[in-house]
Amino acid sequence: MTKHINGNDEVGQVVGDLDWNGLHRPRIYYAMAATFCGLFLSVIDGTICNVALPAIASQLDVPSSDSIWVVNAFQLVIMMLLLPFSSLGELWGYKQVYLQGIVAFTLGSLFCALSGTLPMLVLSRVVQGLGAAMIMSVNTSIVKLIYPRHRLGEGVGLNATVVAIASVAGPSLSAAILAVAPWPWLFAINIPVGIVTFFMARKYLPDNPVRVIGRKFNWRDAVLNAATFGLFIGCVEAYSHDVPPRYIIGGVVAMVAVGCIYVRSQFGRRYPMLPFDLLKIPIFSTSVATSILSFTAQMLGMVAMPFLLVNTFGYDAVGTGLLMTSWPLVIVFVAPIAGWLISKVHPGIL
């Protein structure tokens, strides 16, 4: 089936099966396994090295405040590139973006494991973040292709459970690894998992059933998006590191200027990179705001708590990880119950 599309700045042609309704068993299970593995790796690596930051700072002989960039570099790249890669997935194919993301993430993990200096480790985390951004950007779209429409809620629920568990399981897994191996193994363990995930995804993930022909990727919007979010994180980091106010003010002014240009460019687009049309829906915008606040609070705790337990209370890396294990354990038990209740109780109450 073919459908023509036209916009103020885009012309294209939609070609493919517009009635696609997911995969059949047993392929659906293998495809979801490949999807969950990549997503789990991407999310858990945002927190897995938090417990090891004091050890990394000590071994590389750098201040604790500088070692935070091992975490920040990863998160910064994801924030800058998530929307551009999501847009690219529509044109290039979700499966292709996902596969390239697995490759970049696995190579980044190898470079992290071999790093002997902080700059090299941070640069390697940038490569990891590039891969994670590619994986995360197309994850939900791949889930929609895998599951039939009547089971899509099940797929999205399982996906959310994987994200929730991976978000808080990092310290526990980190403690288990650090109990028997040095910190480079936190990254080396990703390599075999990444290789297996790549071949599983290449074999079982579906290609885009619908392709857009004739519409080009908007590099200008991608650069503006990356610059806006990059300047935002940069200003926050500059403030936390006591950078002179004039530089911070300059960064804020640049962020606002670039951000205004970016936002204005999105209005009137048929395919905006920043979906303001969705944000106009109250329930959607409220849900997004709630999720952002929840994950922000969670990540702040996950980053700060290891330093509190190690530097203030004197726990080692293993003890710190064990104390933080209660968080993911509760999620493991509560998440399935919440998934069962969501069809019976209003989500707002849950």
Describe each model-derived feature in a short phrase.
Residues T35, S42, V71-F74, I78, ...:
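Structural signature of transmembrane alpha-helices in multi-pass secondary transporters
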Residues A52-L81, M120-L123, F313, V318-L323:
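Extracellular/periplasmic helix-loop-helix junction of adjacent transmembrane segments
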